[in-house]
Design a protein with these regions (language model features):
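Short beta-strands and strand-loop turn motifs
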Residues: 100-102, 126-133, 161, 179-184
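Conserved N-terminal subdomain of the carbohydrate kinase-like
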Residues: 48-127, 295-300
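Conserved phosphate-binding/catalytic region of the ribokinase-like
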Residues: 168, 196-300
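Charged helix-capping and loop-helix junction motifs
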Residues: 114-117, 141-148, 194-200, 235-238
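Glycine-rich phosphate/adenosyl-contacting loop at the front of the ribokinase-like
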Residues: 1-56, 64-66
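Conserved phosphate/ATP/ADP-binding segment of small-molecule kinases
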Residues: 145-230
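Short, small-residue-enriched loops and turns at beta-alpha junctions
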Residues: 107-109, 135-139, 166-168, 187, ...
Length: 300
């Protein structure tokens, strides 16, 4: 079973404008809603690739019901804890520039955190948990570490997509995969990286601290894989026009998982991850199976 955990899901309400005039009535040229959140993105892309998952975290109110409905349409099982108040709405205004207004989100009680913990304690070594994203102010800042300590004895396979001290504090729980970008790697180790040799050297520090595999995202230059027992592997991203980078990193994680669950081969999973992340970057929405397969053929 694959489980994705999103602490602070949202509805992204995207409004297209020719021009945003402050202090005046603006007419939209179009608008649409999307279920947002890093773990939710992973579940949606997995569903697009034909892979089932359970999405969990915290949802509330009519906005939470909307997200549950959207996930259900895609065949994604909901394991969310119900909270008081409404799941947040993020407003994204797209015109000559993009302006975002992110909602605050509902209060989460200790009892609701415990309810999530009890659900996660049902996972076993056969399961894979994706834990990702920022920690909202309504949760303890060390919630990642609290969760992983609670389920440590279950030997669940872990993928952690976080940054800074949050990521560093999870490494003792030996995640299967972590996925910083170069800038995040530099910030974690208080250094500047000038070449691939230094990139590999710093990625290996994460291995030494407990990670099994590290993928360093390099934007248009693809990504670097460093893993225990593996030679470092740098793959270029396939060529294409970048339309939207939102969800591209989550899509990389989904592509990696889909192939890893299928074959157990880390290098193949890395390749599919890059293809899947690129497919999302090259489209308005999240990657589809057909888009990913086309890019994989380009990478052969």
């Amino acid at each position: 079973m694959i489980v994705t955990l999103t602490f602070s899901p949202a509805i992204d309400y995207v409004v297209d404008l020719k021009h945003l005039e402050k202090g005046a009535v603006n007419r939209s040229q179009g608008e649409h809603c999307m279920s947002g959140g890093k773990g939710i993105n992973v579940s949606i892309v997995l569903a697009n690739l034909g892979r089932k998952s359970i999405a969990t975290g915290f949802l509330g109110g009519f906005t939470g019901d909307y997200i549950k409905g959207e996930l259900q349409k895609r065949g994604i099982e909901s394991g969310f804890v119900q909270v008081e108040g409404n799941t947040r709405i993020n407003v994204k205004l797209r015109g000559e520039e993009e302006t975002a207004i992110n909602g605050q989100g509902p209060h989460i009680s200790d009892a609701q955190i415990e309810e999530l913990m009890v659900f996660l304690e049902t996972l076993t070594k056969e399961d894979l948990l994706v834990i990702s994203g920022t920690v909202p102010s309504s949760l303890p800042s060390d919630i990642y570490e609290k969760i992983l300590a609670r389920i440590e004895n279950q030997h669940v396979q872990l993928i952690v997509d976080a940054t800074g001290d949050i990521l560093l504090n999870t490494l003792k729980y030996h995640p299967l995969l972590v996925k910083p970008n170069q800038e995040e790697l530099e910030e974690m180790f208080h250094t500047l990286i000038h070449n691939e040799e230094e990139l590999i050297e710093n990625a290996k520090k994460l291995l030494n601290l407990g990670a099994s595999n590290v993928i360093v995202s390099l934007g248009g230059d693809g990504a670097l894989l460093v893993g225990k027992g593996l030679e470092p592997l740098h793959l270029q991203a396939p060529k294409g026009k970048v339309v939207n980078t939102v969800g591209a990193g989550d899509s990389l994680v989904a592509g990696f998982i889909d192939e890893y669950v299928q074959s157990g081969n880390i290098a193949s999973a890395f390749k599919k991850g890059i293809a899947t992340g690129s497919a999302s970057a090259f489209s308005e929405g999240l990657a589809t199976r057909e888009e990913v397969e086309a890019l994989l053929q380009m990478m052969d």
